[in-house]
């Protein structure tokens, strides 16, 4: 069976279609090109004195593993941000 010109065109178009329909995405929901994503919560780690380590642990357990947390003191909040 010979490979005809029509088969080559169909194969080429199929490859182009498949590669153009592949979407790249981050593993973190809501985090894309804009890397300064941040969300803050009034939760226990910062209120009970666990500090930044407790806040990071909370962010990774409740939102996404690729986040880090820090405590803000105005008022007492745990803020989760994307790692840079």
UniProtKB/Swiss-Prot annotation:
GO terms for biological process: defense response to fungus; killing of cells of another organism. Disulfide bonds join 40-80, 46-71, 55-78, 59-79. Residues 1-24 form the signal peptide. It comes from the Eukaryota. Keywords: Antimicrobial, Disulfide bond, Fungicide, Plant defense, Secreted, Signal. It is found in: Secreted. One of its GO terms (cellular component) is extracellular region. The keyword Cytoplasm does not apply. Belongs to the DEFL family. This is Defensin-like protein 116. It comes from Arabidopsis thaliana (Mouse-ear cress).
């Amino acid at each position: 069976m010979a490979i005809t010109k029509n088969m080559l065109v169909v194969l080429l178009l199929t490859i182009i279609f498949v590669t153009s329909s592949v979407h790249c995405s981050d593993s973190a929901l809501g985090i894309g090109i804009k890397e300064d994503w941040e969300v803050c919560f009034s939760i226990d780690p910062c209120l009970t004195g666990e500090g930044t380590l407790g806040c990071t642990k909370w962010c990774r357990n409740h939102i996404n593993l690729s986040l880090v947390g820090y405590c803000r003191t105005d008022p007492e909040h745990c803020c989760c941000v994307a790692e840079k």
